[in-house]
Amino acid sequence: MRVEPIRIETDTTPLDGLWYEPDGDIRGVVQLFHGNTMNFYVGPPRFLPPVLTDRGFACLAYNRRGHDVASNRDSRDLEGGAYQTAAEMIEDNVLAHRWILDRGLDDPILVGHSNGGTLAARHAADHPGIPALVLLSAHRGGKDLMRMIAAHGLMAGDRYEEITAHARALVAAGRGRELMLVPGWWYVISAGTYCEYLDNIPDLLDCAARITCPTLYLRGDEEPVEIYPAEEFVRRSPAAVDFELIDDCGHYYLANEDRVATMVAGWLEAVVGL
């Protein structure tokens, strides 16, 4: 396996990442979408490339502008998940796809974890040339997501109505970049990004109806069905969908990384026909 640091330019902050190539011929390309508050060197974008390159797949793992919770690079200005917009999330994946094509390679297979899975579904719905899609605990997205995750103790938790009203007021006052402390994960988020999640996150199930490529959806058995609706995704998709429930597994696949990587690689070889 050969590994190359890469950078993808945007109209604001560039996207950093790693390009992984197998030692032999490239039999397919995988574009890896990280989850919220994560990045290209943790979670599935970290543990999948060694297994996939062994099977002949090149991999692009990259940060969206909304990586981590908050960070800075060459100034005191902050960037990261606390400031991301839905438009940037979607555009960053388009730019990464274009980066792959500019290397003379074919349309990539998409593999996304959590929010990255929901974004991968949106990208597949918008780009019918995608050959295959892998959703690793993709959340449902849409306008009910924030209320649902709050009911499970995330983000605003039991202060959902209060914090939602406060975020709306800050945005209306032109203070959308102001950071708010919230009682659950993410713990810190700007008012503008909080409202983005209320209003503009892609709806996974709406995307399902527009996806034409085969899909693998994995979910841990410890994850709530209403937030990670694999069964409903299967019902709504016009294309073939394989759903696998992983025993003794939570959202981050801890202690299941090898198992998940082997499942993904095997499915890709079988479905893509490589």
Where are these regions (language model features)?
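N-terminal cap/lid segment of alpha/beta-hydrolase-fold proteins
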Residues: 1-24
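Alpha/beta-hydrolase active-site loop
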Residues: 80-102
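Short alpha-helix in the alpha/beta-hydrolase fold that links the catalytic acid
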Residues: 45, 213, 226-235
